[in-house]
């Protein structure tokens, strides 16, 4: 699921030639996808919390297949392009990508091991990040965009079968269980939105969404703008996927040793450095490789500590739902990153302004994570 989502930026030239869409229209479709992904993450999270993650994820894959089918078979221009690539695939990702799978797996582990567990799930997504861009670039050249999208349906079929085996633990492994066992979802929601740390976490994850979607969507166009070949962007995306495996696993381990908010501060600061070096250096294959590796290590490394902080504060009973809301904030940032990248290019002929924003937002995220208090509600109520 995450691997396929990573490839859509590689389709832009084909969509431009075959469907006549502009960069702004393409960016808008990806932005809509991000918003619907975000809106449906807490909804599918609630389905997972109440009825099981397998049901939520399976439904998501069915919708994913419908979106891909409509995208290659038609109608797929104008508003229908926005519906297929934007709305349907966005809804599907709300169930199949990151928030629900990570949270469902996290429920099986105690707090001290939870970041490792979520890191493993995120690393699995990174395998898709590595393989999917390479496969897509090859398939687009050999078979064309319609056939490539048809091949995507086989991956979706595999994912839907695997999703049937996602089961919740028979008993929650949660120190907050005595407090949350009779708590309703709306009570948990009220607690979350009155917790300063939860609100700051939402603000920080907004930045993550802006950055990774800007890069995933517009790095092919950005590399073309800088006079680099199409394979440069593919290599960047593939390296991001490969080194994200190392980054998420490493962050999962570090989350058991150090304060999660401190790790997030460091991550966002390093993102600012990585982006700045990349855009202010002369374009070259070496810099493409350096950026792919460096940003890959930081790509989804934010997920284990972010998910871990939510679970640490509020417990795991409504983890899929509460983390889904944090992920909605992520997707609002993703919408803005996807849309502004295309908008700035069409208006000013350059992606530079969008990347300047990405650097500034990294500094903002570094600052807002520092005051987060990750003390659980068990402790707060006891005092």
Which residues make up each language-model segment?
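C-terminal transmembrane helical hairpin of 12-TM major facilitator-type secondary transporters
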Residues: 261-309
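Helix-loop-helix hairpin linking two adjacent transmembrane segments in secondary transporters
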Residues: 124-168
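Intracellular juxtamembrane helix-capping segments at the cytosolic ends
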Residues: 95-109, 301-314
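Conserved small/polar residues in nucleotide/adenosyl-binding loops
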Residues: 378-383
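C-terminal ends and interior cores of transmembrane alpha-helices
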Residues: 63-76, 271-282
